[in-house]
Amino acid sequence: MKFDFLLANDGNNIPNKQIKEDKSSPYEFTSNPNKLDPYSNNINNNNNNNNNNKSSIPSSVSLSSISSISSMPISTSLSLSSPSIVISNNNPVLSNEYQQQQQQQQQQQQQQQQQQQQQQQQQQQQQQQQQPVKTVNKKNSKSNKSNANKNNNNINNNNNNYTSMYDNKIQQQLQSIYKQQQQQQQQQYQTQTQTQTQTQTQTQTQTQTQTQTQNSSGGILNINSSINNNLNIYNNTSSNKFKHQHNQQAYNQNLSEINNSRNVTTSSVNANSNINPYPNSNSSINITTTTTTTTNNEILWTTTKPTSSTKHSVILSPPKKIDSYDSPQSSPPRQSSLLISTSSPPSPPLSPIQPTNIVQSSSSSFSSPTYIQQQQQQQQQQQQQQQQQQQQQQQQQQQQQQVETVNNIGNNKSNHTSLTPNLTSLSTKDYPPMYSLNNNNSININNNNNNNNNNNNNNNNNNNNNNNNNNNNNNNNNNNKINNNHFDLNDYQDDNQSSYSSPDITTTHNRYSQQQQQQNNNNQSNYHIDHLNDKSIMKPTKKQIKKQSQPQEKLSKYSEDQIHEESEFLLASILLNLKDSNSTLPINNNNYNNNIGNFNNSTILKNISTTSSDDIGSSNNDYINGSISNEQHQYYSNKYSNQNYVQIDENNNNKNNKNNYVTNNIVNSNTDNYNYYSSHNDFDNNNNNNNNNNNNNNNNNNNNNNNNNNNNNNNNNNNNNNNNNNNNNNNNSSNNNSRNNYNNNSKKRSSSVQISPYPPSKSRI
């Protein structure tokens, strides 16, 4: 319905005294032409341009000319990434209080409204004959002024009547449209839900012509939208007649009341597409809307949101726009529409929605709630199965990773084995193992031609602050253990035998490693280095003894003994090989988590506790605390540099003191005998006096003793490693007897160093 009438008070011809404010009216009036309403689309500017910027502006302008001018730059388009579609959810209705006021005014002013309607019809016919639509020319200004003068008194007397009449018409129209639309939507929603539950294999075709009237700020936008996509905008906004603020508040209030009154808003979608019946209900349709609002060809905002629904949602796929006539179906296109139950938030104000035709792909259909539940149950079952499979795989991987081997410490020299102080790994469940068997079931971790730079199995320890350069990478939780079974070498020595001769630990361990790997393949058991505690695992069988070339007596003695010897030699070699006179020997009384061999952190010994000076003489403290001079050190070093064997504690003083078994064997400066922890030919000089006590397997013909830790010390350039300090000031190449690693500045005589793999509260097995 079109409303054409004259607009009074343009600010030039009518004085301000003629304008009367009606306190009952919700609108406020102003006569200032400079305060332009932001939603009036600069009507005054357009009129001024048409009048060649003269001050004489006609006092009356027809609404048809205003609407034609103001409606052009206002455009609203809704686009989709897939075929375009329109979903309108907002049907603004005025508030109840305002409706009551307007109804009272309507009863009092019915006669005046009829007269004004007749005048408007006559003026509309005259204006259509006299002037064009888009422009206001000088030729028509005289006729417009005459018409304005004729109706000037009526306009001034009934200024509020225009507003009330117009509001009453809009109120009636809004109420009727809202009631009709609500009834239609309820009927369509009921019919569609019934058809979906009964037969989902049939195509639902519904058409609807939706008329929506929005009370936008700055005026009334009457939008008549149909299938033909005709959009007629009528704007009664005059120059500064209404203030934007009050009208915006009224619109927002009405919109909030509508949204609060309805839990679920229903809207229809006009679709022109081919939708084949779906015999299967196992599919769903989702619609994603992208709303783009433009004014004067400028994009104000763009909103993209999926349409949430309580029943189902719609998706149009593929994203390309498909012409309905180009679809592979042979059936002709037919009109169809989808009724969508949405609970999405309302669109922004001042966004008149324009319905467009959509093309729906053949892959879309509806999904039933029962099927959705079935799908959810199936997905949950699949997720549970996947989690179980992942857990099983993780367990298998952990079992495979826990297959460890110790360092190949064979020296390929003679019948005896040089027991290098390479402490085997003591990994726990919290730390992954470091070593595994190769494909040929042989231990090739530390071969000379190993390209993995595993000089001492430190390649996996680069980012670990507790680097165990002597295969102690995973000894963090074994707070009180060096090899889980530290033994006293004196307990295993005969009275007539000064040292313990061991079998070839490499070949023996290879054989047991092969056997244990076969057991892993059969029983999925974990070969862990902690199993060395169990003597039943390490004892050879009769068949294995027959295959072994060495005598049975030596084989029977191998298990804990050799492993424990390694730890003994490691402790002795640590003290012997620290040659840097400027470095200090760290003493950590409380931290049992530091690993032996963690040279990158200068934590060289674990569980180094201080004891009273009664355990060791005061002269021992002088040497341990660094008070010995370099001359004395050079003397003792040269005296014992080429000695391969030194007897261990001839008096056997340590048998009765298990916790302090190393104490009296470190140094005894009262005599010329320095008791080293060693056995027969264990400190093999390799004919060059560069004894890699921790790296006898990684010399690689390199006399520089940097094979132990140089490859993996990422963050510490000043590593107090076992073999990185050969180029000291003394130029002493003898690693066995280098004792210049203590702090000469330390003068403490009240404590001595005690090396114990166990805390004082635990006793050794």
Curated annotation (Swiss-Prot):
Residues 9-61, 128-164, 265-289, 301-373, 409-526, 540-560, 668-765 are annotated as: Disordered. It comes from the Eukaryota. Residues 40-61, 143-161, 301-311, 325-344, 353-373, 414-428, 438-485, 495-504, 513-526, 668-745 have a biased composition (Low complexity). This is Putative uncharacterized protein DDB_G0282129. It comes from Dictyostelium discoideum. The lineage of its organism: Eukaryota, Amoebozoa, Evosea, Eumycetozoa, Dictyostelia.
